[in-house]
Amino acid sequence: MEVLIGDPITTCLSPSVYDIICNLGFQLRENCDINSIVTQNGEVCWKTITDCVSYTESEQGLDYWGSVRLLGPVCEAVHSHFLSLTKGQFEIRYAPWFQWTSFPELFPEIFDALESLQSPAISLSLMKLTSCLERALGDVFLLIGKECPFLLRDLLSSEELAQVFSQSVMNVLKVFVGSPCGLNLRNVLWHGFASPEEIPPKYCSMMILLTAGLGQLLKSYLQNTKLTLAHRSFISLTNLEDLIVFPDVTYEVLSVLEEVMMKSAFILKIMLPYWEVALVKFKSHRFADCAILLLTQLETGLRNVFATLNRCPKRLLTAESTALYTTFDQILAKHLNDGKINQLPLFLGEPAMEFLWDFLNHQEGPRIRDHLSHGEINLHEFSKETTNQLLAFSLVLLLRFVDDCLLSVFKEKSAVELLISLAEGYSSRCHPVFQLKKQVLSCEESIRVWALLPFPEELTRQAVRLEDNSETNACHSLITKMTDELYHHMPENRCVLKDLDRLPTETWPQLLRELCSTPVPTLFCPRIVLEVLVVLRSISEQCRRVSSQVTVASELRHRQWVERTLRSRQRQNYLRMWSSIRLLSPVLSLILLLIALELVNIHAVCGKNAHEYQQYLKFVKSILQYTENLVAYTSYEKNKWNETINLTHTALLKMWTFSEKKQMLIHLAKKSTSKVLL
């Protein structure tokens, strides 16, 4: 791919960041006695370490460069010490001090990585260590504090942790992982800036020792305060079932990926070892490890494309402490910091952007990079299916950066052709638009069950008589008029229901499915579109709650009838409930149809002026208020079935009045040429 042809990139670290990580800690050549750092029993001598931390002249801040320089020999001694131990000795001496973390079994694995001397494995170990440490420190914070800071930097600066571990100890951690002015090991690795050879292994060894030392300090604190450390539960990734688009990665696909990795311009040569280890981890069923490496390298590669397309080559490098890094947040944004259009989304296309937003950014998506980097996921339970999706997407992305002749060869493989086809057809699964479609269809299914609810035959005639009143008839008349109006705004096809007393159960679900399968643009949705979606989703959720309550109440009353435990008043209430249900079923179905049609035309809201928009928002919020009241009236506690009829009549009048103003989105949108087949 010509877009990335240029001089080979030898580092993604800016000069000063490269200097502090790769050079500064090696300037002092003095030997440091390991016995002054850690005892034979594995007890950390914190004073030796904290004495190496330098401060500015005013003593108001840390001298990060001076501290890294002085800590260099200490890290060297610790690294040599660990390499001199057998794994058994390491575990006997240090394993007890990792129990305070929520992932103590990680540390013997890191020890193995250190002994292997393989740079990518050591970098991966540091990433996992920093995420584990962050999670554990958050648990400690909650011994005293109430709301744990989201960023590690803010966590390390908190008074709560200083109270537990001392400020001098927290300053040591800041030098290693807590500030862009220091080594900043967490961020340069998790954001894919550091190549394997650029992370000195001794810093990994030092982080192991610091974690053990923190465990020792915490034990003393807990003994003195009589407090007990509780670990927060790991989170479960959300909406994963919706995100499984690609089939399982086969050995054939893996072999193609291995070949493409060597030839795709997307991968920086200095980063290739990470990709190679990622595949090794996948084959050995270490799916979280594979995902971590893929995510960091997707960020690296996309940052390179971003910097090239937007002609800002310096954005490829780590920023200095005075500027922001270029991370996924900026890479996947619509605009650059200066307000210009980001060229990357235009180059990648909507399907690829939607995939990345689904996995990384959407609040209702799995946000796997965030959760992995903050230590919120149990790595042992990370699913193969999730890693499958990342691997398949990565292959399709890499193929965009090989020459056309090679691409043609790979496309001849049916497995590769299928992945490309699926990737090109991808649409968001985590955007509020998709979630609303899911809600509508789920709620429709729930309401359809009402027709199957049992009702005593001997009560049917009485229930029908209750329905024959002026207000109920007025409701049915309004439903017919509203439905007629909505059906005139179907995409091209028009169909009018004449008999709402007999809901067309065969065609109604199909109609909603067709509407919910209509593509709606989701990438970079305007704020007002998202505001309307929030209200529509709330309406749908209240409809679901009503449906659930109706089902539960009906089944309970029928059981009581069969068991002959219904008292006289309860029997009358049962009749009113059944009469109400026969009205609520078409009303809720009408609301779902309205939601689906407004959703198809959701972007028409951008054409409203401020006054029109506020009027429209008031309208949809009035429907929300109605459904919220329905939830209250149909609850087991209130059981006000008669009142739902008056409530419904008032709501339908408001809906019809607003409809006559022709200010709904269906009235503003241009006619679609797509067909809804009934």
UniProtKB/Swiss-Prot annotation:
Listed PANTHER family: ENDOPLASMIC RETICULUM MEMBRANE-ASSOCIATED RNA DEGRADATION PROTEIN (PTHR31701:SF2)
Protein name in the entry: Endoplasmic reticulum membrane-associated RNA degradation protein
Disease: Periventricular nodular heterotopia 6: A form of periventricular nodular heterotopia, a disorder resulting from a defect in the pattern of neuronal migration in which ectopic collections of neurons lie along the lateral ventricles of the brain or just beneath, contiguously or in isolated patches. PVNH6 results in delayed psychomotor development, delayed speech, strabismus, and onset of seizures with hypsarrhythmia in early infancy.
Topological relation to the membrane, as annotated: Multi-pass membrane protein
GN (gene name): ERMARD
Bilayer-crossing regions: 390-410, 587-607
Organism: Homo sapiens
Main function: May play a role in neuronal migration during embryonic development.
Signal peptide: none
Keyword Transmembrane appears in the UniProt entry: yes
Cellular component aspect of the GO annotation: endoplasmic reticulum membrane
InterPro entries from the UniProt entry: DUF4209, ERMARD
Main localisation: endoplasmic reticulum
Keywords noted in UniProt: Developmental protein, Disease variant, Endoplasmic reticulum, Membrane, Transmembrane, Transmembrane helix
Superkingdom, taxonomy of origin: Eukaryota
